[in-house]
Swiss-Prot record:
It is found in: Membrane. GO terms for cellular component: membrane. This is Uncharacterized protein MT1407. To M.tuberculosis Rv1363c. Residues 39-48 have a biased composition (Polar residues). The chain crosses the membrane at residues 65-85. Residues 1-50 are annotated as: Disordered. Its main location: membrane. It is a single-pass membrane protein. Keywords: Membrane, Transmembrane, Transmembrane helix.
Length: 220
């Protein structure tokens, strides 16, 4: 009987020890789980913080981009505006009246330059000079005195020019280019019958004291 009681007590003690071990193991597991959860929470918080900082950096990096684009657009717009004012606006600041005045000056000047008679050379040259300015005026004086006048007197050359058409090629407040189409008849002592010639001239003008004057005369 005593041995049986001893065995029962022994088994009870063993069972109690097993239960205590299981309980301790369970508590250890719970503690480990709680520690893991805490670590996970800490890691999750750290990751969120890191993502927040990364996102903030991206925002800081990306925010200047629209500003740069705006600045580039403003610069581009300013450059476009400058080009418009520099190249195109002056044409628009001149009205149709200015264009007609430039065409008239180019036409009258062309007729004066290409028309002369041996009997009225001085008057013809003076009329032509009144339409000229700048270096071209100096060139015309030299050319007529050295070339045109001697030939006109010697051969009795007489030329008469008529403008057929004229149109503005470029127009600015203080300068213009006009394309002029001319018919010219010429007679001489050796050829009394008029010979006709058609030509075109690019006439460059400058506004001097409010008047359009020819500064270049280029056959084309």
């Amino acid at each position: 009987m005593t041995d049986d009681v001893r065995d029962v007590n022994t088994e009870t003690t063993d069972a109690t020890e097993v239960a205590e071990i299981d309980s301790a193991a369970g508590e250890a597991g719970d503690s480990a789980t709680e520690a893991f959860d805490t670590d996970s929470a800490t890691e999750s918080t750290a990751q969120k913080g890191q993502r927040h900082r990364d996102l903030w950096r991206m925002q800081v990096t990306l925010k200047p981009v629209p500003v740069i684009l705006i600045l580039l657009m403003l610069i581009s717009g300013g450059a476009t505006g400058w080009l418009y004012l520099e190249q195109y606006r002056p044409d628009q600041q001149t009205d149709s009246g200015a264009a007609r005045a430039a065409v008239a000056a180019a036409s009258d000047g062309t007729i004066a330059l290409l028309s002369y008679s041996p009997d009225t050379l001085d008057q013809d040259f003076a009329t032509a000079r009144s339409h000229l300015a700048g270096d071209f005026l100096s060139y015309y004086d030299q050319f007529t005195q050295q070339i045109v006048a001697p030939a006109a007197k010697q051969k009795s050359l007489k030329t008469t020019a008529k403008v057929v058409r004229a149109a503005v090629s470029e127009l600015h407040p203080d300068s213009a280019v006009v394309l002029v189409f001319v018919d010219q008849s010429t007679t001489s002592k050796d050829s009394p019958n008029p010979s006709m010639a058609a030509s075109s001239v690019m006439v460059t003008l400058a506004k001097v004291d409010g008047n359009w004057l020819i500064t270049k005369f280029t056959p084309v």
